[in-house]
Amino acid sequence: MGIKVSSKIKRILASTGYIPIFIFKYRYYFYFFYCKFARKFVTKKIIILKLSSIGTASGSSNPKDGADVDVREEYANAFRTESYNHFWTRVVQLSRKKSAVSSSSSSPPIESSSTSARLMSYRLFAHNLLDPDLNTITRILDVSRVGRHTRTLLSDYFLETANAFLLCTQLLKNIHHLRSKYESLKPKFHSENHNSLALIDQFTEISKWFDPFISSGSRIQLIRSGCLYLLKRLESRRDKTRAKLKLINGLTHSSGLLVLALTTTLIVTIASHAFALFLAAPTLLASQFKPAGLRNKLTKTAARLDVAAKGTYILSRDLDTISRLVTRINDEVNHVRAMAEFWVGRGSGRVRGSEEVARELKRCEESFSEELDELEEHIYLCFMTINRARNLLVKEILDSDDPPNCSFAPKSKKKL
């Protein structure tokens, strides 16, 4: 399939000048064969690269190493970036317990695949890590040249992020208490010689520790709804500011044509002795259509509102994810607690009930621990996101042609 052209025919066509016509006439055939050849070449190249990578991996490692790859560890390593290490350093510095600081500094780098082993440190510090704090934010907004409406919106943004930060801190405390109580109960379920009646009573009592954790779901939704309302206000104000800026830019560009037309008309209609005045008219009139100060102010305001809107949107998505994780844990806890309450109500079947509850706890033990670790790690990443967004907005507020001379301005840091 295809068209073969001999060298003799090519020479004849070349002598007559028909090669361009021939190529144009059969251009689709040339394109078809070119694509077919390119696809075969790329496929062959990919196969060769895969075979070479497999050969290299098999030659440098044992066959058992492929089966021992820990996906959770690889996922965790993806988050150990420069911002992760920077935040971890701040965790150690802000810890009030010197023993914890010394032990964390003397311990080797974190290599465990368990998420709980990596996240033991920040349970002591969360309320100290909000950056910048509310007092600093208040002073920055007071000395900055921000409009009244914009200042109100930015102040509400910092307040909402602070509330979300405090909520995440409370969630961490609840997770810590929940894990400690669960760990104290777990060996008794694994023991073969346990008191079945006391076991169910103890689990029923410990299940009350889940109530503050369960009630936090409504608070998450409340803060998230506040973030969504604030996001609408920020976007509305930003769009209005951009519309004003676009209008001013349009007037600025059209003022040149307007002045030129007006000057030409005046030159034609007025006597020549006023010609010098007409030459100065474009400069005088153009100055009325170039509000450079207002344009710069609107540009900075739009940029600040845009940064705040992006930070609010990301925070709302993080809170939505945290809410889903909390709901998933609540469903599993309610399932086990309902089973325990069912066997408690049976009375005579409490011995069998303890066995059923113990069996159910063994079944969901691993998934329950992983869910707590996943929630804890996402809260930790939410801390970093909140601080990064707040610092970006503060930098945008202080970044101007004549920045205020304030000693509390954030120092230059590495970009998170």
UniProtKB/Swiss-Prot annotation:
**Is the keyword Zinc-finger assigned to this protein?**
no
- Membrane topology listed for this record: Single-pass membrane protein
A Pfam family assignment: DUF677
Q: Say yes or no: keyword Cytoplasm present.
A: no
Gene Ontology cellular component terms for the protein in this record? membrane
Q: Where are the transmembrane segments?
A: 266-286
Keywords assigned by UniProt? Membrane, Transmembrane, Transmembrane helix
Major subcellular location class: membrane
Q: Which residues form a coiled coil?
A: none
Q: Where in the cell is it found?
A: Membrane
Q: Which domain of life is it from?
A: Eukaryota
Q: What family is reported?
A: Belongs to the UPF0496 family.
PANTHER family, A to Z: UPF0496 PROTEIN 3, UPF0496 PROTEIN 3-RELATED
Protein name as catalogued: UPF0496 protein At3g49070
**Which lineage do the record's taxonomy fields give for this organism?**
Eukaryota, Viridiplantae, Streptophyta, Embryophyta, Tracheophyta
